[in-house]
Amino acid sequence: MAASGVPRGCDILIVYSPDAEEWCQYLQTLFLSSRQVRSQKILTHRLGPEASFSAEDLSLFLSTRCVVVLLSAELVQHFHKPALLPLLQRAFHPPHRVVRLLCGVRDSEEFLDFFPDWAHWQELTCDDEPETYVAAVKKAISEDSGCDSVTDTEPEDEKVVSYSKQQNLPTVTSPGNLMVVQPDRIRCGAETTVYVIVRCKLDDRVATEAEFSPEDSPSVRMEAKVENEYTISVKAPNLSSGNVSLKIYSGDLVVCETVISYYTDMEEIGNLLSNAANPVEFMCQAFKIVPYNTETLDKLLTESLKNNIPASGLHLFGINQLEEEDMMTNQRDEELPTLLHFAAKYGLKNLTALLLTCPGALQAYSVANKHGHYPNTIAEKHGFRDLRQFIDEYVETVDMLKSHIKEELMHGEEADAVYESMAHLSTDLLMKCSLNPGCDEDLYESMAAFVPAATEDLYVEMLQASTSNPIPGDGFSRATKDSMIRKFLEGNSMGMTNLERDQCHLGQEEDVYHTVDDDEAFSVDLASRPPVPVPRPETTAPGAHQLPDNEPYIFKVFAEKSQERPGNFYVSSESIRKGPPVRPWRDRPQSSIYDPFAGMKTPGQRQLITLQEQVKLGIVNVDEAVLHFKEWQLNQKKRSESFRFQQENLKRLRDSITRRQREKQKSGKQTDLEITVPIRHSQHLPAKVEFGVYESGPRKSVIPPRTELRRGDWKTDSTSSTASSTSNRSSTRSLLSVSSGMEGDNEDNEVPEVTRSRSPGPPQVDGTPTMSLERPPRVPPRAASQRPPTRETFHPPPPVPPRGR
C-alpha cells in the first residue's frame, strides 16, 4: 500500500485497486485540467492484493478533505479482510467527505454491513458527466470547510443525497456559504477593496485570507480583514484582465469561492459601445417606443413586413428547402447570417413566425452562424425557450407534411415528379390553417367551390374587381368583398326560393344549368363570360314537361359557336334542343394533380359554412350573418397577432397529422384519406339515367357503384396498357370534392388525442455549456451543432473494469 506524493494531508485523495488504475489516471487528468479544483492538492492511494494499512496511511486519510473511492471488484475483496476492515472504516469517516465511484460493481445492501454510513456517501457512476465528478468533489470539500460545524445548524450525520441525480452547480459560487461579492468587476491598475458577505459566522481569532487565482498566472494570497461575523474585506491585487477565482480561507478551511473579473479601460469602452449599439434599443428609439418594449417593436416590424408582402402571401414559392445533407458545410462566418437568426436572438416571436412562412425559411433555418448555432439554439441560448420550441415544432410539422405526402403519393414511375409538385401545393396549407387563418384572398377565391349556384355572379364580380382595381396587394375592394360574402350566404336560400316559386311545375325536370327568362336583363355579354362552372343540380320530380318560354343557359353560351360550326360529329344542336334534359358526365379532372389536403377547410371557410347553414335554417338573416362574419374576422385578426394563438393552431395541425398516422397504424390500411363524392344541395337524389353533353342516348351504366378508393389502389397490377392506368387516375381525380375527410382536423374546439414529443430532427444542443468543462469524447460529436472550443482538454475515460463475482 502506497500513496503518491508526500503524506502530509491533501485536498483530494483517490483510493483505487490495480483493476481501476485507468480510471484513477483519468480522474487525475480531469481534476488537474479543471479550473475549479486544479488548485487543490491531489494524491492517489493504491490498495494492492497484499496491502497493509499503517498509522501513517490512516493519518493521511484523516487529514484529507475529500476521499474518492473507486469501487472495483478487487477493492471490494479488501472489505472481507477482518484485519483491514476496521482501519478502512476509520479512514472513510466522516461520510460527508467520501465519494464513491462504481467501477464495474453494483450498489448493494451488503456494503451496509461493512460501513454503517454507506448511505451517506455521495455516489457516482461511470456514465455520469465529467462536470458531475468535479461538482461532487467540490461539494465534499465545501462541506468539510467547517462552516456548518461553527453555526451548528445541521447535524454531522445528515444524509447526503446522491449527487449524480442532482443538477450541476453553477460555476460562479460554491453552494451554501457565499452571499454577496462587491464589486465583482475590478478595473486593472486601480486600488479596489472587495467586500465579501458569507452566511456562516467567522471567527476573528483565526487568520482570514483571500486567494486570487488568475487563469494564466500564479495565485496571489492577500490578508483579509474581518469587518464583522459575516463580512470580510480585502485589497484586490493588481492583476491582468480576465476572470479570476477568489477563495476565502479561515485558517486552512475554504469558507467560500467565487469568480470576479478584471477589465481594462478599452474593454470597458467596448462594453459601453456594444450596449449603446444594441439594435433593439436603437430601433425602439428610432420608432419612439418609450419605454423600450420588445413586444411592441415585434408587432411593429411584423406589421411592416406584412404590408410589404403580397396579400396572397409568398408561400406560393414554397418553403421546403431544408438542407438535409452535409449541414456542416452550410455555415457562415457571421454572428447573425440571416434575419431569422436576428429575430431568434432578440426574441421577436411574431416576426419569427412570419419569416418561417417566407420562401427560403427552412434554408435559413439550416444555416449555422460562426459559432455553429442555429436559430432555434440561438433563441434558447438567449432565454427564449418558448420560441425555441415553436421553431422546432414548425420545422417538424413541415417535415411531417412532406413525409405524409410522400407516403400517400410515391407510387410508380412518376413518384418523384408527383411528390415534388405535391410538396409545393401543400406548403400553403401550413400557413392557412396555422399561422394565417384569416387570409381574405384565399377565402374569397375559394367561396365559389362551395356554392356552385352563385359561381357565375361571383366569377364576374371577381374578374371585374381584378381588372378595375390595379392596386397591388388589394385584389378585391371592400364593396366587392361584402357582395361576395352576401352572395355566398344567400347561396342555398336563393335556391330554396326558386324551388318554392316553381312548385306549380312539379314533375318538371329542369336543366342542371340555370335557365334564363327572356325578360331578364344581363349587363355582361354572354360571349365575354368566363367558362361555365360546375352545374347545380335541382331536386324536381322526373318526367315533367318543360316550359316553352325557358331556354337552357348552355345554349346561350354556345350560340355563336354553334352557328360557326353547324354540325357536330357526335350529335347535332337540334337534337340537343329537342332532346330530354341531360346531366353532364365529367370526364375531365378539375386539376392535374390530386391534393390530399384539398378538402381541409380553413377556419374562415368553416365559419362561412356555419353561417350559411344558419341562414338556410332561418336562425339569422343574411344581414346578421354578414355582421357576425365581419366581427369574427376582426376578432380572428386580433387573435392571430398573438404568438400563443399561432402556437395553438400549429399544435392542432400537428395533432391532426399525428392522429391520422396513428389511426393508419392501428387499422393497418394503406391510406387514411378516403375520396368521397362531391357534396350536393340535396343528399337524396333519385337514380336517373346519365347523358353526356354531346351524346344522343343514355349510357349503359346508370350511376357507378360507390366504392371507397384508396391511394394504394390508384395503380393496379396490370401495366400492359398505358391508357388503363391513365383512365384509372382520371376517374380518381374526377371524384374530387370539397370534402375529402379532413374538415374536422383543424377545428378550434378539437381536443388533441395525441401528445407528440419533440423529434430529434432539429439540432437540440445548445452551444453554450452550463460549465466550462466538456464531456470526454466517449460519444462522437454531433454533426448538427458543435461546441465552441474551450481551454480545457479532457481525455476519454477508460473502459469499465469487469464485474466481480
Curated annotation (Swiss-Prot):
Q: Which UniProt keywords apply?
A: Cell membrane, Coiled coil, Cytoplasm, Membrane, Phosphoprotein
State whether it acts alone or in a complex, and with which partners, per the record.
Answer: Homooligomer. Interacts (phosphorylated on tyrosine residues within YXXM motifs) with PIK3R1 (via SH2 domain); required for BCR- and TLR-mediated activation of phosphoinositide 3-kinase. Interacts (via polyproline C-terminal region) with ABI1 (via SH3 domain); the interaction promotes phosphorylation of PIK3AP1 by ABL1. May interact with MYD88 and TIRAP.
What this protein is called in its record is Phosphoinositide 3-kinase adapter protein 1
Modified residue annotations for Phosphoserine = 642, 718
At the highest ranks, the source species' classification is: Eukaryota, Metazoa, Chordata, Craniata, Vertebrata
**Domain TIR span(s) in chain numbering:** 8-145
Q: Which organism is it from?
A: Homo sapiens (Human)
- Annotated PANTHER family: BANK1/PIK3AP1 FAMILY MEMBER, PHOSPHOINOSITIDE 3-KINASE ADAPTER PROTEIN 1
Report how it sits in the membrane: Peripheral membrane protein
Q: Please state the gene responsible for encoding this protein.
A: PIK3AP1
Tissue expression per record: Expressed in natural killer (NK) cells.
